[in-house]
Amino acid sequence: MKLLNKLTLKNLRLNKVRTIVTIVGIMLSAALITVVSGMALSGRQTMIDGQTEWSGNYDVALDIIDTAKIDKIRQNRNVENAFYKERLGYARTKNADGEICDYSVLAMSENTYGNCFKIDLIKGKFPTNSGEAVVTKSFKTQDGKYVKVGDKITLDVGVLTDKDGNVLDEEGIHNLLQKDFNKCSIIDTVKRTYTVTGIIERPKTSELYDPSNLSMIYTVSDEKAPVEAIKTKHMNKLYIAYTPQSESNYLQNTADILGFKADDMSNVISDEISPEDQQTSGINAYEFNSVLLSMKGYGSSDATNTVIFSLAVII
């Protein structure tokens, strides 16, 4: 071994130029590998950020949940955050100019704003209780004026039905075009009053979708949906974000929360939960944020993983 070292050193001294070129080449190669790896990771993070803005920052959504289950879920050691959202309903008014104005009212837990869904605040602040709300900048009052921070708004908020009188669920609302929305009716209204605390841009998040011409109102939920939420198809959801340490085990985590076997969980919406399982789990359905999970390296989407790997190879 000593002889080999001596021969190597002697060879390096005799070929100084080649030695310097070799050392520089090694340094450049190491630097290039570091730069390429950094660019690949940066590109992956950009994709994750974009998907988070579109779908929301969560791992699984529990659809039509019995709110009595929420506190227990939040106490689960694998859950970092749980964000609650419920659709309070819709309202329709005619302003002083004779213009028909439609409104959508959503209530969310206070920690949802900025943590689960990206909502850009133009002025003011986010609401802190169920008597406060933020509204989109297109919001007009009944006298035809744009609303300001500090104004009080009162609306008759009710359930949306299609032209045939059928109550629309979340899927029906997502499939609703603006021209069809104009034919819908609003029934079983309740008068609701809010103090406007802020003005926001219209969110781009798919989970906050409403037909484009509606003004949107976001308030804070008291998380007291009907006890029979599952049977009455009350439109509410709980979005769960697992801790970084347990996120890779999202299937088992979700199975534990719902009281299912991990083998029964799939990476798609489950719309065939039996009545017995509904009572056990306290939900009507569940859906994983599968694209986001795949981008983080946890999901099973081959297409998403292939795109990320291809980008790294191209770079």
Describe each region flagged by the PLM.
Residues 1-31:
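N-terminal Sec/SRP start-transfer signal
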Residues 3-7, 38, 191:
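Charged, alpha-helix-enriched surfaces in structured cytosolic catalytic cores
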Residues 8, 12, 31, 35, ...:
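Juxtamembrane interface helices immediately C-terminal to a transmembrane segment
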Residues 14, 18, 213, 305-308:
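Low-complexity, compositionally biased segments
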Residues 21, 33, 37-41, 306-315:
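A hydrophobic alpha-helix feature that marks transmembrane segments and, especially
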Residues 22, 26-29, 122, 134-139, ...:
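Hydrophobic alpha-helical transmembrane segments of multi-pass small-molecule transporters/permeases
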Residues 41-296:
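Basic-flanked hydrophobic alpha-helices used for secretion and membrane insertion
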Residues 283-315:
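Hydrophobic alpha-helical bundles that form the membrane domains of multi-pass transporters
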